[in-house]
UniProtKB/Swiss-Prot annotation:
Subunit structure: Interacts with DDB1, CUL4A and CUL4B.
Chain's role: May function as a substrate receptor for CUL4-DDB1 E3 ubiquitin-protein ligase complex.
Disease affiliated with this protein: Woodhouse-Sakati syndrome: A rare autosomal recessive disorder characterized by hypogonadism, alopecia, diabetes mellitus, intellectual disability, and extrapyramidal syndrome.
Protein name, as recorded: DDB1- and CUL4-associated factor 17
Transmembrane segments: 186-206, 222-242
């Protein structure tokens, strides 16, 4: 069944002016986003490269803000030219921000300070300080000293916008200790906080004496995920671990005596002691073996995706039920392609329970449904497929004339990700406009040209195609963001040169304007 006809923009605006909406929360917002989606996808709308900038340090983007110099300078991406929001004072290398997350105010919560109702940047510095910075002014609102006994390096959401996990670098031990044969049992530490107001859950150590020869660990949605070099992945409940093995409840800003030393929790030089030390193997929730520890959970009901733990199985994905490990019908997904870069698969971020499988020349959106007359088993089927625009031939014939004049014909196979054919590089989802964005690249002569396509998330129909004016080198690292009426392309070139290209939605008047090239 095809898409139904929807009201045009004028009709939507008229209904909005008259207040013709139900009383459901969010109806006006959804209507506004529907109007914006119609404007984005209409034929006369263009996306123009309004400004470009270059930097010697990494460039990051988050919700309309572009960050330079390790998050020290923030520029608005909304204006038609670079508009600086703030610039923090210069700092030493040890004080630079290494990782950051954007926190946005929850709806309906009563917060202690008026500044808490505005967005904040939660930042981790090189010298183990956790900062909460105003996203509009750059002012430091809160600061917590983590610990002197390890180097914290990574920030991630355990529960989005509610709980953060701060992960340390892996403890390799000193060269002297390794030469002396002294084994380092603690692999890494995980510090867990609830945000706004900041409160400490605890710091957990990952100890090889308990978990064995573990190679990595992380925290996601309250689950401790432990990985091994053999490909084994094990899942544990973090809440159960905290309740069972927490040595002492610690509160930020309160006095604490630990190991014969007294100090204030979260202040230098005392920091936060490691107060969750596992002394016995916690209850195991789930384990599975997968190539390169690749493991994902999603779908309705819960399913997981793994690759069988054999190198020759790379590119083969098994979709299984979490409750009993049973393979879904048609649950072995393998894309028929020959390419240098492997295809990838993941659960659709729109919470529909669907699965996106991306190869060099096609994007498959798969759906998980119950088998008729057997509600306990599920099957995988295609919802829709997006195909690259390329000529339908895999074999090329080359004619060679020998010295004697004999014509020799040789046949060879083209790779599916051959740069001279249109190849998919990035697939993302714009949740507010409900659009799939797909970056496709083709090598033309010496340079690559890319375009960003918007597809209907429900049916896969192509709604809009935006050419990117800058050349695209497939050997460089690229990120492309589509955020409402903005497209942003960040490119990392050799010798740590970063470029940022900003495109904004405009109404096509037929007049060409000069693109602004700025150094931010």
């Amino acid at each position: 069944m095809g898409p139904t006809r929807k009201p045009n923009v004028c009709s939507r605006l008229s209904r909005r002016a008259l207040g013709c909406f139900s009383r459901d929360a969010g109806v006006v917002q959804r209507t506004n986003l529907g109007i914006l989606r119609a404007l984005v996808c209409q034929e006369s709308t263009k996306f123009k490269n309004v400004w470009t900038t270059h930097s010697r340090s990494p460039i990051a983007y988050e919700r309309g803000r572009i960050y330079f110099d390790n998050y020290r300078r923030c520029v608005s991406s909304v204006a038609s030219e670079p508009r600086k929001l703030y610039e923090m004072p210069k700092c030493s290398k040890s004080e630079k921000i290494e990782d950051a997350l954007l926190w946005e105010c929850p709806v309906g919560d009563i917060l202690p300070n008026s500044s808490d109702y505005k967005s904040s940047l939660i930042a981790l510095t090189a010298h183990n300080w956790l900062l909460r910075i105003s996203a509009t002014t750059g002012k430091i609102l809160e600061k917590i000293y983590l610990a002197p006994y390890c180097k914290f390096r990574y920030l991630s959401w355990d529960t989005p916008q509610e709980v953060i996990a701060v992960k340390s670098a892996q403890n390799r031990g000193s060269a002297v200790a390794r030469q002396a044969g002294i084994q380092q049992h603690v692999l890494l530490y995980l510090a867990v906080f609830r945000v706004l107001p900041f409160s400490l859950v605890g710091i957990l150590e990952i100890n090889k004496k308990i978990f064995g020869n573990v190679t990595d660990a992380t925290l996601s949605h309250g689950i401790l995920i432990v990985m091994y070099s053999s490909g084994l992945v094990r899942l544990y409940s973090f809440q159960t671990i905290a309740e069972q093995f927490m040595q002492q409840k610690l509160d930020l800003g309160c006095a604490c005596r630990w190991g014969g030393t007294t100090g204030t929790v979260g202040e230098a030089p005392f920091g936060i002691p490691c107060n969750i030390k596992i002394t016995d193997m916690p209850p195991l929730l789930f384990e599975v073996s997968s190539l390169e520890n690749a493991f994902q959970i999603g779908g309705h009901p819960w399913h997981y995706i793994v690759t069988p733990n054999k190198k020759k199985q790379k590119g083969v994905f098994h979709i299984c039920a979490l409750k009993d490990n049973s393979l879904a019908k048609n649950g072995i997904q393998e894309m028929d392609c020959c390419s240098l870069e492997s295809d990838w698969i993941y659960f659709h971020p729109d919470a529909s329970g669907r699965i996106i499988h991306v190869g060099p020349n096609q994007v498959k959106v798969l759906k998980l449904t119950e088998i008729e007359n057997n509600s306990s088993q599920h099957q995988i089927s295609e919802d829709f497929v997006i195909l690259a625009n390329r000529e339908n031939h895999k074999n090329e014939n080359v004619l060679t004339v020998t010295a004697s004049g004999r014509v020799v014909k040789k046949s060879f196979n083209l790779l599916d990700d051959d740069p001279e054919q249109e190849t998919f590089k990035i697939v993302d989802y714009e949740d507010e406009l409900d659009l799939l964005s797909v970056v496709a690249v083709t090598q033309i002569d010496a340079e690559g040209k890319a375009h960003l396509d918007f597809h209907c998330n429900e049916y896969g129909t192509l709604l809009k195609s935006i050419p990117l004016v800058e050349s695209w080198d497939v050997t460089y690292s690229h990120e492309v963001y589509f955020d409402r009426d903005l497209v942003l392309h960040i490119e990392q070139k050799p010798n740590r040169v970063f470029s940022c290209y900003v495109y904004q939605m405009i109404c096509d008047t037929g007049e060409e304007e000069e693109t602004i090239n700025r150094s931010c």
